[in-house]
A protein has these predicted regions:
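ABC ATPase NBD coupling module
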Residues: 42, 96-113, 132, 140, ...
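Helix-to-loop junction immediately C-terminal to a conserved catalytic motif
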Residues: 79
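Conserved ABC ATPase "signature" region
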Residues: 147-164
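Conserved ABC ATPase signature
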Residues: 169-173, 177
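A short, surface-exposed alpha-helical micro-motif characterized by mixed small hydrophobic
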Residues: 235-237
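ABC ATPase "signature
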Residues: 253-254
Length: 297
């Protein structure tokens, strides 16, 4: 009798279907073939040359290079402040390469990407209290003040600051406290990506270690981070991957441990050899554990 069903030629039960692999999460940041030029005519120079880089959700990537290497240009291009000559930039899945100022402002208001300056006072309005500086991004989104203030208190705790600092002005805080407030402000809107420009270069050793530990925790919680720095040693213990820029070209990228212990490019070897903070990496780890036990400041 013909059933119309396919025969099992093996005589056994039908083979189970192979489950489809889950799709890889889209990158929080994807830079492809990026070229940037400054100037015109004979004065035209190339600041970035074919740079490609991706950052996964929850990944921390350190972009390292000396002054003039192109790292700040890369950050400014990712943030829509510089228009590339060629290539593309995708932030949070959106191709933002040709976004104008209006669309970029809308993207920032939605909180997809945030930026933390080297000088935290550039992130904080000197005429606003810490509370007003923190809640401003959520108020712009139309959220209520009570909700915004509750989140501000929660984030101050996350960056190990007391919530009684909400009533203070930025000028009343130490440099390390201001930098932690700037990080908290960047987190207010729940961004997928935060770009930080030299986040610890102006801090003393204790504050440097504490900020880097906070950043490491943010990455573990799912926020993608790009750390811009001239000092390989300052981010080697925090970054998952290191990307090395030299004269506008990406000369090496890899797991942070591999780049530090087995640098492939001569320029990277030079950076490793000239990074005094690498020699104190184990001491930094010990200090992180001690600092975690300290009360909030």
């Amino acid at each position: 009798m013909t059933t119309g069903l396919p025969e099992d030629v093996t005589g056994g039960p039908p083979a189970a279907e192979t489950p489809a692999r889950p799709a890889a999460p889209r990158p929080a940041l994807e830079v492809t073939g990026l070229d940037v030029h400054y100037g015109r005519g004979r004065g035209r120079r190339r600041a970035l040359a074919g740079v490609s880089l991706s950052v996964a959700p929850g990944e921390t990537v350190g972009v390292i290079g000396e002054t003039g290497s192109g790292k700040s240009t890369l950050a400014r291009t990712v943030l829509g402040l510089v228009r590339p000559s060629a290539g593309s930039v995708r932030v949070g899945g959106e191709d933002v390469t040709r976004y104008g100022n209006r669309r970029w402002r809308a993207l920032r208001r939605r909180g997809v990407v945030q930026y933390v300056f080297q000088d935290p006072l550039r992130s904080l309005d000197p005429d606003l209290t810490i509370e007003d500086s923190l809640i401003e991004p959520l108020l712009i989104q139309g959220r209520g003040r009570a909700e915004a203030t509750a989140r501000a208190r929660s984030l101050l705790d996350r960056v190990r600051l007391r919530d009684d600092l909400l009533a203070r002005m930025p000028s009343e805080l130490s440099g390390g406290q201001r930098q932690r407030v700037a990080v908290a402000r960047a987190l207010m809107s729940g961004p997928e990506l935060i770009v930080l420009d030299e986040p610890v270069s102006a801090l003393d050793s204790a504050n440097r270690v504490q900020i880097l530990e906070i950043l490491k925790e943010l990455g573990a919680a799912g926020t993608a981070l790009v750390l811009i720095s001239h000092d390989l040693g300052s981010v080697a213990g925090t970054a998952d991957r290191i990307a090395v820029l030299h004269h506008g070209a990406l000369v090496e990228t890899g797991a942070a441990r591999d780049v530090v212990n087995r640098p492939a490019h001569p320029y990277t070897r030079l950076l490793v050899g000239s990074a005094p903070t690498l020699r104190t990496a184990s001491a930094d780890r010990a200090r992180r554990e001690a600092l975690r036990a300290l009360p909030h400041t």
